[in-house]
């Protein structure tokens, strides 16, 4: 669930609402957890494959290094959703004791809320570098790896540190409990009025969308000219990046709608739709990479499917030559 807004929606309940059915709300949670747990497992496997089991293969490819950062972010966001955010929204039987626990242990809220916004800020930055990486691979295929290898350390540092320039107000701001459905979630007020985290994130995502669209158009135009000169593996990663970009634009669209339409942004509809919009990206990302990249799928799942199976080594056929000696005895031919 997205809880970036520092301006809470109109809330009438200042305590847990007992009118929601425990069973119905729990089923809602289980249904959402059911589709979030498998991608979380895939994220963990992808990170294990890239950085442990097949480190020598993937660490030399800058795209996978950058994508591993996206996997870390997506993995943590799913864990927060599964075990904290949606858990306490859709498990109303824990609303009273859990809300009191968080209110009496404010350190947990002071960690959770800035961390959530940090991850949401890092995602568009990673998206920018993913699309730029694929665009440069078709524009400068010869020098592409050399340039990205040289600047990879800077990219990692930039993505890791720059979100703090955006989320600083969420760190120093007081955190509160917002009662929602039969449960609750945690939100931050603004210590500095003009430093609106929703606006900051909207600007970052807007820049990411503009760069993504421009890079994708350039990439497709260049790929159409290269045709068969481009390696199939590079084409595969470009395709994966394009689909990933589409998934990124889905939550970005609804975030923009909430920022430009105040009535929608403060309505319960926004708070209901936005989490599922983010699921398109966080749940879809590992599925896309596993589906599109045959090599990664083979390493992560240790299976091969269809046309993306690793090519088998050609069979060696040994040909033995037999020499026939012919002799004639009394007109009879004898073969040895």
Curated annotation (Swiss-Prot):
Quote the subcellular location field of this record. Answer: Membrane
| Transmembrane segments annotated in the record for this chain | 30-50, 64-84, 111-131, 152-172, 200-220, 237-257, 271-291
User: Where is this chain primarily localised?
Assistant: membrane
Output the GO biological process annotations, alphabetical, semicolon-separated. sensory perception of chemical stimulus
Membrane topology, from the record:
Multi-pass membrane protein
GO MF annotation, one = transmembrane signaling receptor activity
Q: Name one GO cellular component term.
A: membrane
Family of the protein in this entry: Belongs to the nematode receptor-like protein srg family.
- Spell out the protein name for this chain: Serpentine receptor class gamma-9
Q: Which organism is it from?
A: Caenorhabditis elegans
């Amino acid at each position: 669930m997205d809880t970036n807004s520092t301006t809470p929606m109109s809330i009438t309940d200042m305590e847990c609402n007992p009118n929601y059915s425990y069973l119905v709300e729990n089923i809602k949670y289980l249904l959402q957890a059911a589709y979030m747990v498998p991608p979380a497992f895939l994220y963990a496997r992808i990170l294990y494959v890239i950085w442990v089991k097949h480190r020598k293969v993937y660490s030399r490819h800058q795209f996978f290094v950058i994508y591993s950062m996206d996997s870390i972010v997506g993995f943590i966001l799913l864990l927060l959703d599964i075990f904290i955010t949606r858990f306490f929204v859709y498990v109303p039987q824990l609303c009273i004791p859990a809300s009191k626990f968080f209110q009496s242990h404010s350190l947990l809220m002071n960690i959770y809320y800035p961390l959530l916004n940090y991850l949401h800020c890092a995602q568009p930055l990673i998206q920018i570098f993913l699309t730029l990486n694929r665009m440069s691979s078709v524009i400068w295929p010869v020098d592409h790896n050399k340039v990205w290898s040289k600047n990879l350390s800077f990219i990692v540092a930039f993505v890791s540190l720059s979100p703090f320039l955006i989320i600083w107000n969420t760190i120093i701001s007081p955190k509160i409990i917002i009662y929602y459905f039969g449960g609750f979630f945690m939100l931050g007020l603004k210590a500095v009025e003009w430093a609106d985290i929703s606006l900051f994130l909207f600007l970052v995502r807007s820049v990411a969308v503009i760069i993504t669209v421009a890079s994708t158009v350039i990439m497709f135009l260049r790929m159409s000219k290269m045709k068969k000169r481009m390696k199939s593996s590079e084409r595969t990663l470009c395709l994966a990046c394009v689909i990933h970009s589409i998934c990124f634009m889905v939550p970005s669209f609804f975030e923009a709608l909430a920022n430009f339409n105040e009535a929608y942004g403060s309505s319960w509809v926004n708070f209901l739709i936005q989490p599922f919009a983010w699921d398109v990206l966080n749940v879809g990302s590992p599925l896309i990479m596993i589906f599109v990249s045959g090599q990664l799928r083979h390493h992560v799942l240790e299976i091969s499917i269809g046309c993306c199976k690793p090519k088998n080594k050609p069979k060696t056929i040994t040909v033995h030559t037999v020499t026939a000696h012919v002799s004639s005895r009394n007109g009879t031919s004898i073969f040895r």
